[in-house]
A protein has these predicted regions:
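Metal-dependent phosphoesterase signature
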Residues: 1-2
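C-terminal cap/substrate-recognition subdomain and adjoining C-terminal extension
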Residues: 5-9, 14-17, 24-245
Length: 245
């Protein structure tokens, strides 16, 4: 995402401790975070022993994966959410059990949901920061538990171009083409706590169809308007990424 490298550099320059907690498989997560300047010990991700798993699979297993992948590529991830869920539910819960592929998949433990909260707890203990002093940024259902944990502790739970599962659990939202646009919220929170963040959001309010960034106060509010704005920016970010190849 545009602005990611600049945000990391800014946070480091300002003395922040930064970690990455992601459901992404380790092969991609390590490579990406290394490019952003994060050391491996500050990254929690999903272990995926690819060579070990490949050795357990046959042609029929790989054909099943190819078939589901082809079906997924035909779906719009935003507009076909129910079809996406039904397709994956049928594959994981009906087709895979009892097969070599199913047994291999069962050994993979994604870092999402409660495992993200556990990983955050480990970083918090290592750095001796209470959760009330944390800023967390998330965008999807795999982030909802860690967003809620930081929100409920009094920290800053930022939803960036999030879906409704994340928006329901954050206390603030940012819809933008650049990740750097979370920085004004972080600074407002540092200076004035959650009240400071809320004041910035009020000052920066704009019509839903305006260019970004858009800032939203989410805690205790109807997220319908924010959800529409965030969905628009999710699509825009994906279009930019697709254009870049």
């Amino acid at each position: 995402v545009k602005g990611a490298r600049e945000l990391m550099e800014r946070l480091a320059a300002d003395g922040y401790q930064v970690c990455c907690i992601t459901t992404t498989y380790e092969q991609y997560a390590r490579r990406l975070t290394q490019r952003l300047g994060l050391p491996a010990e500050q990254v929690a991700c999903t272990a995926f022993p690819i060579e070990e798993l490949r050795a357990r699979l046959g042609d029929a297993d790989m054909a099943a994966v190819d078939r589901v992948e082809a079906a997924l590529l035909k779906l719009d991830m935003e507009r076909d959410e129910e079809r996406l869920r039904d397709l994956l539910d049928a594959f994981y819960w009906q087709e895979l059990p009892g097969t070599p592929l199913g047994e291999a998949v069962a050994t993979v433990k994604p870092v999402g949901g409660r495992r993200k909260v556990q990983a955050l707890g480990q970083f918090a203990r290592a750095w001796q920061f209470d959760l009330s002093r944390w800023v967390v940024v998330g965008d999807s259902i795999t982030d909802n538990a860690v967003l809620a944990a930081v929100r409920d502790a009094g920290g800053l739970a930022i939803v960036f171009n999030g879906n409704r599962y994340a928006l329901e659990r954050g206390n603030v939202g940012v819809a933008s083409l650049s990740l750097m646009d979370v920085m004004p919220l972080v600074e407002a929170w540092e200076d004035g706590g959650l009240d400071g963040a809320r004041q910035l959001i009020s000052r920066e309010a704009k019509p839903p169809d305006a260019d970004g960034p858009h800032y939203h106060w989410l805690a205790g509010t109807d997220i319908a308007e924010a959800s529409e704005v965030h969905a628009r920016f999710r699509r825009l970010v994906r279009q930019v990424a697709a254009a870049l190849g």
